Amino acid sequence: GDHVKAGVKAYAERWAQDGIVEAGFVDYINDSSKITYPWSMIDKITPRPHEKVQAMLAEDGFEDNNTIITEKHTFTAPFVNAEEVQYLVCEDTYTNGRPPLELGGALYTSRKTVDEVETMKVTTCLNPLHTAMSIYGCMLDYTLISAEMADEDLRAFIQKIGYIEAMPVVTDPGVLNPYEFIGTVINKRLPNPFMPDAPQRIATDTSQKLSIRFGETIKKYIDRGLDKSNLVLIPLVLAGYARYLKALDDNLKPFEPSSDPLLAELQAIVAPLEVGKADQDYSCLKNLYSHKDVFGLDLYEAGFGEQIEGMVKELFAGKGAVRQTLHKYVSAR
């Protein structure tokens, strides 16, 4: 809503400046008794267009369905493959009636509650699990999230991140139950084989996601004086990011990291490190994990730097070390 308001206001002010509209028009769009810009939260996992869906549609006669990859490496097609589960939560601040979206399952509520639903989803119940699966899924050669959910280590990884580590600080919006929400994510949404989502898609722009998806949970532990030793698998996700940046899978074969605005910069930081090299200098990690713009806080100042550094050393031990390290920490929780 705020983004829409900013865009509309910018156009209106420029139009008034250029004499296209009267000055009163700007006052009109800023009058909250007449015009509002409701906040909203939508949650419906929508992967890239998948060739299996494309082939199914072609068999049904819809043949002109080619996927286009844009210059920004986004994917578009004349069809959308998405999941059945969906949530739409809207701020109820309409001034002259509103569409009865509640008849289709949408929720109308306050701005505060919309924000709380978004916080619940993005910092605890869905997005952190997605990112954990994307980082380790890429290194373990997975191309489907649903296939990852059949992997005992990965499934337990996200279950324990969600229920054990993130839930103690979850935001409960009231209109949706966090435990029911995350249960649907783990047991229904992510294992769905008919939703061909890929860890490579989710790994896009990971540097822009870590601060919200994990940094906020760490901050809440600190702010509330909670036992930081309860955080083990979230640090393992962040340790895995350093290993992911080397663009080598667990068999030491190269893979192409997903598009990310900070990819080159962060890869340069870990460039001195080699997978499988004994007794190397890991001091470059202080530069990586003190990046507040990436992690939301200086992880060394927060008391997690040395813990993460130790995990990174295990992940860099050599071929098979990603699986071995993941299994070790997940099974111990």
Where are these regions (language model features)?
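Substrate/ligand-engaging "lid" and interaction regions
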Residues: G1-R333
